[in-house]
């Protein structure tokens, strides 16, 4: 991207900007090692489209993601919830090994991998779930990268909304490049 630099102003040509937000143009580099090739997160994470309609007479296990790399756990201490008590009727079914993001708490390091005991549980659209291309990256490595202070700061910068409801821009998240060693390493 060609950028003309003046004392107080930076100019970039629109055709050279992959994301038209001012924040993207002036974002700080995350400072990851140059030892490995960089890859966009969207090149190995694909959003799950496994959505269901909640049935009032069925029971469901729900998922939440703890902040500060605290893990992915069952909501309500693992108690099942009747569909009639669930307000959002369209939800996503999760599977073990998928990567999950809390849109609201990504700025606080709320990323994780669905554990085996939450197979088949559900989440709202505020928790995007991604299938991981394990031929390119291990889900645990993505958790490691996404909970570094630099990455959490990136998540904070690309979150917008009112004070306690700032949500990460998932498109910016998927466009972010990270170092990607070979899976064998």
List each model region and its residues.
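Non-catalytic DNA-recognition/assembly elements of restriction-modification systems
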Residues: 1-54, 179-185
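A short beta-sheet element
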Residues: 91-92, 96, 100-148, 161
């Amino acid at each position: 991207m060609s950028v003309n630099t003046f004392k107080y102003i930076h100019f970039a040509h629109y055709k050279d900007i992959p994301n038209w937000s001012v924040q993207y143009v002036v974002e700080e580099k995350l400072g990851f090692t140059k030892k490995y090739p960089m890859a966009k997160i969207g090149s190995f994470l694909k959003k799950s489209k496994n959505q269901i309609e909640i049935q009032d007479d069925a029971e469901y296990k729900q998922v939440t993601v703890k902040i500060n790399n605290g893990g992915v756990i069952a909501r309500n201490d693992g108690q099942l919830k009747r569909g009639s008590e669930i307000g959002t009727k369209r939800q996503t079914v999760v599977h073990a090994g998928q990567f999950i993001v809390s849109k609201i708490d990504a700025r606080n390091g709320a990323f994780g991998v669905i554990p085996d005991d939450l197979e088949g549980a559900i989440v709202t659209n505020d928790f995007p779930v991604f299938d991981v291309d394990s031929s390119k990256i291990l889900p645990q490595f993505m958790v490691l990268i996404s909970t570094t202070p630099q990455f959490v700061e990136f998540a904070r910068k690309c979150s917008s909304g009112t004070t306690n409801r700032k949500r990460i821009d998932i498109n910016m998240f998927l466009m972010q490049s990270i170092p990607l060693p070979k899976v064998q390493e």
